[in-house]
């Protein structure tokens, strides 16, 4: 569809209104749900747990854009020892994604979550239960224990809580990133630089909520 000047102006204005509403909803959601976003005991924190800036990532192990962005997140915490990276499973791409998210969360007590998380993104092909358990076994995790504990109500509850939180924040898809109290576009191109710039901005201007 080709728009005339008036039509184009109307479309741009409508997009601006929608964007403003989305941003306003997210900012309200962040203020109301800061504790769940930044300090939920069910979310794994990589990097420096006591860091001065929180970066939050909502992701699905079968999301190609999440896969592309994962190295930038790893690079960020490797290069900045004061960043705390809060990882939130948000499986939206089917049963495989949900099962793998459950396995990943069940690995936290065994102390190998981050290694499993990174391998799930670096190994080619779709993330499935079989692949997740194979990787877990290669990392020395007790897979029988994983299969049992992934069914615990706390694991399913953590995923349900992430879904509810995402809805409250107006998250419309994955990946979804936040640095401090503001969203960062999930586009893979330039993600690392965008994260670094936003981290620097938070350090300079602070965060409107307890991040």
Feature-to-residue mapping (PLM):
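C-terminal cap of thioredoxin/glutaredoxin-like
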Residues: 1-18, 134-211
């Amino acid at each position: 569809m080709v728009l005339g000047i008036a039509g184009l102006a109307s479309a741009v204005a409508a997009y601006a209104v929608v964007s403003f509403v989305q941003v306003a909803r997210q900012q309200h959601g962040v203020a109301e749900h800061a504790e769940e976003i930044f300090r939920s005991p069910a979310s794994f924190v990589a990097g420096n747990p006591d860091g001065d800036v929180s970066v939050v990532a909502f992701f699905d192990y079968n999301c190609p854009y999440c896969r592309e962005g994962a190295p930038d997140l790893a690079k960020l915490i490797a290069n900045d020892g004061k960043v705390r990276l809060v990882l939130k499973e948000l499986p939206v791409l089917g049963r495989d994604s949900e099962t793998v998210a459950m396995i990943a969360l069940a690995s936290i007590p065994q102390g190998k979550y981050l290694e499993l998380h990174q391998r799930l993104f670096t190994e080619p092909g779709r993330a499935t239960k079989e692949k997740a358990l194979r990787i877990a076994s290669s990392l020395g995790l007790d897979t029988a224990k994983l299969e049992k504990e992934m069914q615990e109500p706390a694991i399913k509850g953590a995923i349900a809580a992430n879904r509810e939180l995402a809805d409250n924040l107006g998250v419309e898809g994955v990946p979804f990133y936040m640095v401090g109290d503001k969203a960062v576009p999930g586009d893979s191109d330039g993600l690392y630089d965008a994260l670094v710039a936003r981290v620097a901005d938070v350090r300079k201007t602070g965060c409107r909520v307890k991040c």
